[in-house]
Amino acid sequence: MGDTPFKATSMEDLNDTISKIINYRFKNDAILEEALTHPSLNKRNSKNQIENYERLEFLGDSILNMIVSAILFRLFPKEKEGALARRKTDLVCGNTIANVAKEIKLGNFIIMNNSERCNGGKRNLKNLENALEALIGAIYIDGGFANVKKFVTKHWEERAKGMLSLPQDPKTSLQEWTQKNKLPLPEYELMKQTGPAHSPEFTISICIENYGKVFACASSKKVAEQKAAELMLEKINNSEKTI
């Protein structure tokens, strides 16, 4: 099938094809369709509610983080929290998720409007990342935790085992990238702090020349800065990478 967009005659046909790739067949075709529908389609259901993959993406992101955390906890019993967190950050970053999506050729199945498709939407790394997270959420809704755990473990455990050394943290990677490209070093700005003292949330921003600004939130400044750096690296990669 290569990189040719898949043309299904029905959702059942699409379900049959994808089931052979992911080793899971959806009981509810509608859940699969929602997981593959890009927001550009502006699809609405009988209740006039917008149906696309964004809600399932939100769910799938949390499920992926949980299962990958459990995999790392099992594989690296002697490592401290900080080291495990660095491994997880690398395993659940946008680039890794998009690479898994490319391995299963998920872009061929994303449903989007003509404009998005003509602009390379089926190869866009962010679209691939979002659709795969939505697919993970959909497998959980349709088939339960055991099935989604099987899918995530298949595609992430070997990656985790292959991490012979700790990955570089996103802040260091971003700093090295700016130095290499002769740009000012990234500055992390605290935009706001919300929530009670015992459970605060920090919003951090970074602005890189020619790439604009990104924002990230977390329960500590350190984690928020790492997330912001990761988002900026993904933004840079999406802007520069030719797929």
From Swiss-Prot:
GO CC terms, sorted: cytoplasm
Residue ranges of every copy of the RNase III domain listed in the record: 15-144
Coiled coil: none
Molecular function GO labels: double-stranded RNA binding; metal ion binding; ribonuclease III activity; rRNA binding
DRBM domain mapped to chain residues: 169-238
PROSITE patterns the UniProt entry points to: DS_RBD, RNASE_3_1, RNASE_3_2
Cellular compartment(s): Cytoplasm
Enzyme class label: hydrolase
Active site: D61, E133
Entry keywords, A to Z: Cytoplasm, Endonuclease, Hydrolase, Magnesium, Metal-binding, mRNA processing, Nuclease, RNA-binding, rRNA processing, rRNA-binding, tRNA processing
Amino acids binding Mg(2+): E57, N130, E133
Assembly behavior: Homodimer.
Family in the record: Belongs to the ribonuclease III family.
Matches recorded under PANTHER family: RIBONUCLEASE 3, RIBONUCLEASE III
Family annotation (NCBIfam families): RNaseIII
Name of the protein in question: Ribonuclease 3
Gene that this polypeptide is encoded by: rnc
